[in-house]
Amino acid sequence: MICLKILRFYQKFLSPLKPAACRYYPSCSEYALWQFQKKNFFLAFLSTFFRILRCNPFFKGGFDYPKVSKNFYPMNLCFKPMFLAKKQLCFLYIPYKNKSFYLIKIIFKRTNQ
């Protein structure tokens, strides 16, 4: 998706040129990246737009994780465990309301032991 490429370009080349000033965690660009990865274009655009509007001196700031809606289905009890889950796990879904979850990204690197 072109939006993801534009956001990654901004994070890699433009964002380092200015001081870190985002009032929220995750930063507005990271928030937008997560939204575009997990929602359709229209909803991601609206969520990002309102987040950028909130990122100003009149708002307190703090933690503002993206909220996503997702249906989880019961897994089959006969499955093979994945021993390399750390390598494949990218996001955690923390329950918020009925079928709404906070989206939290896993940011660790696998170390060789």
From Swiss-Prot:
Annotated TM spans: none
Cell compartment(s), UniProt: Cell inner membrane
Disulfide bond positions: none
Keywords of the record: Cell inner membrane, Cell membrane, Membrane
Keyword Cell inner membrane: yes
Topology versus the membrane: Peripheral membrane protein
InterPro entries: Membr_insert_effic_factor_YidD
GO CC annotation terms, alphabetical: plasma membrane
Chief location: membrane
Family: Belongs to the UPF0161 family.
Protein task: Could be involved in insertion of integral membrane proteins into the membrane.
PANTHER family named in the record: MEMBRANE PROTEIN INSERTION EFFICIENCY FACTOR-RELATED (PTHR33383:SF1)
Name used for this protein in its record: Putative membrane protein insertion efficiency factor
UniProt source species: Campylobacter jejuni subsp. doylei (strain ATCC BAA-1458 / RM4099 / 269.97)
